[in-house]
Amino acid sequence: MTATDPVANLQTLIRCPSVTPAEGGALSALEAMLAPLGFTVDRVKASEEGTPDIENLYARLGTDGPHLMFAGHTDVVPVGDEAAWTHPPFAAEISKGELFGRGAVDMKGGIACFVAAVARHIEKSGQPKGSISFLITGDEEGPAINGTIKLLQWAAERGERWDACLVGEPTNPDRLGDMIKIGRRGSLSGKITVHGVQGHAAYPHLADNPVRGMLQMTHALMDPPFDGGTDDFQPSNLEVTTVDVGNPATNVIPAKASASFNIRFNDSWTVETLRAEILRRLDAAAGNGELRPGRDPVKYDIVWADRPSHVFLTRNNALIASLSSAVESVSGQSPKLSTTGGTSDARFIKDYCPVVEFGLVGQTMHMVDERVAVADLETLTAIYETFIARWFANAGL
């Protein structure tokens, strides 16, 4: 086996059961691919109290600039019901032109293809006039505390600097070449608790039902819309994700009700202005007596989740142009530049260098029978190889 073969690379990685937080041999397998290509490889273990230790990998080829980083993750989500899979989730079997396995799309496939692209570039043209690095974590699908964010800090403290980054997440909705992600919405979560007075359901005048107050509060969070979208981002959207009263009895008015929410927000907002708007809405709803006639304002408190994600947009023309032209020349498609979807580790990388995302088709990610077309692996490798050549050619412009 040589690292120039993306299919063999991916099969090797899939056969490593690296469900977060387990390394599962995946980083060791990647190290074995990169070291023969001339990469200096560091394994970095990160820890934080209350969270599992995580193994990460940083590898660099070259010592000079310009410096291109490829970022991704080898950890995968659980397989779910293994009996429902038509092929074992860690066997990496090929059937009817598709390679099956957990992580095939998200995102061991992207890593396998970029390794192959670098190997082919070296084989044909020698080492790039600059540096290429791999920044790979085992903690993207989990809490993302001991992963990319700490690996970036570790590398930066050692003097590492990057000019651009490509993240190999599965960005394409339907066909390879559909979409490049050039930014991401922000993400903010919180938990509201409404306090009432417990009592008998037959004697509501002696109690204060917090569910009524919670209905007011959650409605105020979702209506009216926060905005209508911007030139680069879709409208901000808030979803209530859990509601709980902790009360199994049908004849008891509960003492409190809680609800969690998450909002994905665009560049109309910052975390600070969004928190202020949410509090404004909650305070206004608390004093609305429509659902609680004759009652005092709703008593509530709110706890904000740690580590909100900030909105960002990449405007680096050389990076975007190099990738867009590579996608179009290989796939024949002109990719859409998009900021849709959820968050990724690009949210951490954007603080260090311009970052874009492009990988496989994401239709089966996290699903039973996650799989990728073998032909797509070859196409993505060709796109990455073309991108590498064009980025280094344009990086000094």
Curated annotation (Swiss-Prot):
Keywords: Amino-acid biosynthesis, Cobalt, Diaminopimelate biosynthesis, Hydrolase, Lysine biosynthesis, Metal-binding, Zinc. The active site is at D75, E140 (proton acceptor). CDD domains: M20_DapE_proteobac. Binds 2 Zn(2+) or Co(2+) ions per subunit. Pathway: Amino-acid biosynthesis; L-lysine biosynthesis via DAP pathway; LL-2,6-diaminopimelate from (S)-tetrahydrodipicolinate (succinylase route): step 3/3. Zn(2+) 2 binds at D106, E141, H366. Its cofactor is Zn(2+); Co(2+). Catalyzes the hydrolysis of N-succinyl-L,L-diaminopimelic acid (SDAP), forming succinate and LL-2,6-diaminopimelate (DAP), an intermediate involved in the bacterial biosynthesis of lysine and meso-diaminopimelic acid, an essential component of bacterial cell walls. Homodimer. This is Succinyl-diaminopimelate desuccinylase.
